[in-house]
Amino acid sequence: MAGDTTITIVGNLTADPELRFTPSGAAVANFTVASTPRIYDRQTGEWKDGEALFLRCNIWREAAENVAESLTRGARVIVSGRLKQRSFETREGEKRTVIEVEVDEIGPSLRYATAKVNKASRSGGFGSGSRPAPAQTSSASGDDPWGSAPASGSFGGGDDEPPF
């Protein structure tokens, strides 16, 4: 990865991510990010849209399942990954080359939105192809030390002195 070209893109998803599975069971999500630069025109005093850049992206394994479950068309995202060149031949026999982003990290942009993040539970390792249901509960569990306030005192004891 030392010679890879890394890129960070901020843009919007042009469609819902497309989730597929390889014959071996590895998940892959494909999606396109549209990034449009904004240019300030000093003569008119207005912001104008520049030419949009559309980049095809792919992400693998558990992260692919998380992307497909979490992100939808129009979502503003921040993508970090590596540019990859791929050549293929069309059904008509024409050779084509595309540049894609192999995504390392992705998340929603919080500049104009809010998000609630739930940690995904791991149950089956890489390539399991199963999507565990998120464990959400509205009441505090007895096993969760952060789920409720301390029983007494500000430091868990009965006095007002810190324990150190």
Swiss-Prot record:
Biological processes, Gene Ontology terms: DNA damage response; DNA replication; response to antibiotic
Keyword DNA-binding set for record: yes
The protein's name: Single-stranded DNA-binding protein
SUPFAM superfamilies: Nucleic acid-binding proteins
A Pfam family: SSB
GO function term, MF aspect, one: single-stranded DNA binding
Taxonomic source organism: Mycobacterium tuberculosis (strain ATCC 25618 / H37Rv)
Keywords assigned by UniProt, alphabetized: DNA-binding
CDD domains found in the cross-reference section: SSB_OBF
Residues in the signal sequence: none
Database matches in NCBIfam families: PRK07772.1 (NF005851), ssb (TIGR00621)
SSB domain mapped to chain residues: 1-110
InterPro entries hit by this protein: NA-bd_OB-fold (IPR012340), Primosome_PriB/ssb (IPR000424), ssDNA-bd (IPR011344)
Subunit description: Homotetramer. Interacts with DnaB.
Any one of the GO CC terms: extracellular region
Function: Binds single-stranded (ss)DNA. At low concentrations (0.02 to 0.16 uM), stimulates the 5'-3' helicase activity of DnaB. At higher concentrtions eventually totally inhibits DnaB helicase.
Region of interest (Disordered), residue spans: 120-164
